[in-house]
């Protein structure tokens, strides 16, 4: 049974005498740092030299240091820089400056789980992963609410890693909503699978296939765009708010009949078998190896496939149609 923690389970006092060094000031970095500061904790920011985020962080009231110096000053080091650069930054700026008894925090388990970062045995390692983008983490905190989060402990040198993680989660507002216990393995593998098979890879490929099917059958690309991409937001919003039940309650009976009878023919057992292969490719580390090598080679496949989609008919039509929708912020 899932184990969930709330406000009463976390003691913010565990962090009151500590300095939290937040590395990175992007989507999660700015939100987590500001929430921690507003919770009465001492927070500093670590950024690479000449970072464009430096002025923003200073304007938000933080002392900003180069990454290595922030690590030296910190007791809790929260690593919120992109996955693909974490390993290099860890080896260069973090590992040489860690002290015994420090805690390393993450919001995604990729580099720990796949062995790209191997912390020394004399530090705690935990993960607190808010299940929303940074702007929502911040907004909910300011409204006196919070977003759900995940908690995992990879290494418990102090005997208090779980408690420190919960204290951190409370500081950013997650315990207001609930924090679910997990592992670095579970968070990493399910997160990657969701991105590849459903949220990003599965969704974009479904959109492209549907759009191309209609256009190849002679329908206007603009109409195909509305039916296969634009209206997706209406359905996703309903799913987000109330699951399958609310979505099906809100659409027409004709749409629901097509949903429940035709949908399984599109996403059939063959697709599910492919999904199992995708999951296995994540579990055995092959995807991680591919992504690491892709970055070392300056992303030739990443850049080529992205450019291809950016120049597609789907994107050209979408750009024109979105100009007709003043409610959409570009």
From Swiss-Prot:
Active site: 108
GO biological process, one term: L-valine biosynthetic process
UniProt function note: Involved in the biosynthesis of branched-chain amino acids (BCAA). Catalyzes an alkyl-migration followed by a ketol-acid reduction of (S)-2-acetolactate (S2AL) to yield (R)-2,3-dihydroxy-isovalerate. In the isomerase reaction, S2AL is rearranged via a Mg-dependent methyl migration to produce 3-hydroxy-3-methyl-2-ketobutyrate (HMKB). In the reductase reaction, this 2-ketoacid undergoes a metal-dependent reduction by NADPH to yield (R)-2,3-dihydroxy-isovalerate.
Residues annotated as binding NADP(+): 25-28, 48, 51, 53, 83-86, 134
Pathway info: Amino-acid biosynthesis; L-isoleucine biosynthesis; L-isoleucine from 2-oxobutanoate: step 2/4; Amino-acid biosynthesis; L-valine biosynthesis; L-valine from pyruvate: step 2/4
Required cofactor(s): Mg(2+)
Location of the KARI N-terminal Rossmann domain: 2-182
Gene name as annotated: ilvC
Keyword Magnesium (UniProt): yes
NCBIfam families: ilvC, PRK05479.1, PRK13403.1
Keywords carried by this UniProt record: Amino-acid biosynthesis, Branched-chain amino acid biosynthesis, Magnesium, Metal-binding, NADP, Oxidoreductase
Residues that bind Mg(2+) 2: 191, 227, 231
KARI C-terminal knotted domain mapped to chain residues: 183-328
Lineage of producing organism: Bacteria, Thermotogati, Thermotogota, Thermotogae, Petrotogales
Protein name per UniProt: Ketol-acid reductoisomerase (NADP(+))
A single cellular component GO annotation: cytosol
InterPro entries, alphabetized: 6-PGluconate_DH-like_C_sf, KARI, KARI_C, KARI_N, KARI_prok, NAD(P)-bd_dom_sf
Binding, substrate: 252
Annotated residues for binding of Mg(2+) 1: 191, 195
Entry note: cofactor: Binds 2 magnesium ions per subunit.
Family as reported in the entry's similarity comment: Belongs to the ketol-acid reductoisomerase family.
Keyword Transferase appears in the UniProt entry: no
EC number of this enzyme: 1.1.1.86
GO terms assigned for molecular function: ketol-acid reductoisomerase activity; magnesium ion binding; NADP binding
Catalytic activity: (2R)-2,3-dihydroxy-3-methylbutanoate + NADP(+) = (2S)-2-acetolactate + NADPH + H(+); (2R,3R)-2,3-dihydroxy-3-methylpentanoate + NADP(+) = (S)-2-ethyl-2-hydroxy-3-oxobutanoate + NADPH + H(+)
